[in-house]
Amino acid sequence: MNYDELLAPAAKAMRPSGIRKFFDLAADMPHCISLGVGEPDFKTPWSVRDAGIRSLELGRTKYTANAGLKDLRKEICTYLQRRFELHYQEENVLVTVGGSEAIDLAIRALVQPGDEVIIPEPCFVCYEPITQLTGGVPVHIATRAEDQFRLTADQLRAAITPKTKLLIFPYPNNPTGAVMSAAEVEEIAAVLRETNVLVLSDEIYSELTYGLDRHVSIASLPGMAERTIVVNGFSKSYAMTGWRLGYAVGPAPLIKVMTKIHQSCIMSAPTTSQYAAITALHQCDDQIEMMRDEYNRRRRYVVKALNEMGLTCFEPRGAFYVFPSIQISGLTSSEFCEQLLREKEVAIIPGSAFGASGEGYARISYAYSVDHLQTAMKRIREFLKEHGWIQK
């Protein structure tokens, strides 16, 4: 059979992940130091693991309600009000298999063929392909290093057309670590209030901000909750990536439609993970603070080390990534990262994997031990010196 003729054109056109390529290459190098994975190096807090174990011992292994356990949805509402001044009821919450499923459901529920979806770049890799699979048209906005990769109101205003349906608002940002201040979020909201454009606010890194830059959800601002779907989850803040649990909150009519799609393709999120997540929301504020403090220590070290060796790097205020310029090499970001991997066995991700505006940069995760980071920084410095790009 000619499977190429049978496959859906939109699915065939999907590009493979530029991140996965480097994971696969690094897997064959036993001494490779990887700074590529966007995953906490901490274990899930014991109280959360214990809650999952207890749920299994009690025989809680059946499906839950499609939207998720009622107790978990209540706890999510309480948590969002306590932490981010967001006010929701159970009917506004859908528990999903990770934040990525919530993003997929939101885009599929909202976007029709020909609708434009504004996506600030550089950005997480899933927004564009999901939009394209629905027949939507991605409209990219290239954020700039001089703005610390934050979306500006002027950029947004210029990108909106009569066909614009949705803005993806991914802050704190992967891959840049950019955080929007309260004033900057309000400027974006002011533009949107003049339109019928909806917002998909990806807030998976909302607990991971540093210094005075506490995360401000755009849905907390006047007139914005009614047009915003907030996506969040447990993977990053609670070190629960393998538990595969996220959620979406938003206007009940939108969440209801997303739940119908979720019911058809997933049924319900993992039951054990949901019981564990209730404990995470109840008991893990101290563990979040501990992990955040440690990320902050690593962040300061990596930013200082990169700048000292000549890889210009602004100070990110969120997530657990830095996004240094590699332009002193004269190489593309893919060439730079491939050479570094081959010659020094250090895996980082080319900025171009996160969109065209990421060219000339690379993403480095600091979700690793300080010893791991120090070894990687030493190898990167040696790599730069051996090629004559720096003299230090």
Feature locations, PLM:
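A short acidic, glycine-rich active-site loop
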Residues: 59-63, 291
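Conserved N-terminal alpha-helix of the aminotransferase class I/II PLP-enzyme fold
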Residues: 63-97
